[in-house]
């Protein structure tokens, strides 16, 4: 492989892939190109930066130069890739171009900002770079509106509340974590956030944001309005697919790949938050770790289809943490819920009596691995 492997991106997926490639081949040329600094940080830490009084720079774990030296890489930070010529095997930026044998898209996903009037007043916390841009405003803000009551929104609401801020959490749905589990299961977290002082605005839709002398006025479709100092969009992620489209590879919600992490072009692959694996977008750490192991083998001449076991998803709400697994979002499951002072176990059973999903909280999380073994997938 004389021209080697190019990876576009520098996040968790790209780094895991580099480490797995180097375990098997110390010498294949590896080049990483990314728009950011390429310094390493732990993205899940962004859910806890406010309560822990962390600045953006405190999150840095390893500088880009150290990473390059450790794994024998060529790095091109602060570099925007503008085009990919898939047939010629060339990646282009404004003033450079690189040839490759194999190309990996690890471009991640961007925070979705609702298309409302005043959307430019919304902040996002999807990267160290984004946090760096707004950390002073967030630290100084006393009244915070978080739009989106999913996994990230719920984590942020608890964190800001623990930091002593006045928090409003808004969602279109009638319950929190609505895309992950039914309301009877998420209600324990919902009640706890309310007890902490988080003001929930459920079944509510934001219409517009306006700058005022006192801060920001958020007006709902119902015409109810609230004054806040900062508004955070936690309304989900959209896989970054623009480069894949330019390369002419198949795209749906994400960059379409098969079990080998291969796109519709045989020498272009995708991994991480940007990838749609056999129809599924899986923006969680464990699938990415496993994808990196299999993709490293395939890039180096192997043929190993990715096999994903039942996996835990963790909701990092420290005062009431949750672990979930299986098809928790299915509407045809019968839920058996045991809730006690030390935690909750909720089992989603199929009509045939099979365990298809579960959610555990607090001290009952220690039972998660035993439940994983009995989960029907």
From Swiss-Prot:
Catalytic activity, as annotated: 2 reduced [nitric oxide reductase rubredoxin domain] + NAD(+) + H(+) = 2 oxidized [nitric oxide reductase rubredoxin domain] + NADH
Alphabetical UniProt keywords: Cytoplasm, FAD, Flavoprotein, NAD, Oxidoreductase
Functional pathway: Nitrogen metabolism; nitric oxide reduction
Disulfide topology: none
GO molecular function, one term: oxidoreductase activity, acting on iron-sulfur proteins as donors, NAD or NADP as acceptor
Protein location: Cytoplasm
Cofactor: FAD
EC category name: oxidoreductase
GO cellular component terms given for this protein: cytoplasm
EC number: 1.18.1.-
InterPro entries hit by this protein: FAD-bd_OxRdtase (IPR050260), FAD/NAD-bd_sf (IPR036188), FAD/NAD-binding_dom (IPR023753), NO_rdtase_NorW (IPR023961), Rbx-bd (IPR041364)
UniProt KW Flavoprotein keyword: yes
Predominant place of localization: cytoplasm
Stated family: Belongs to the FAD-dependent oxidoreductase family.
Function (record text): One of at least two accessory proteins for anaerobic nitric oxide (NO) reductase. Reduces the rubredoxin moiety of NO reductase.
Name of the protein this chain belongs to: Nitric oxide reductase FlRd-NAD(+) reductase
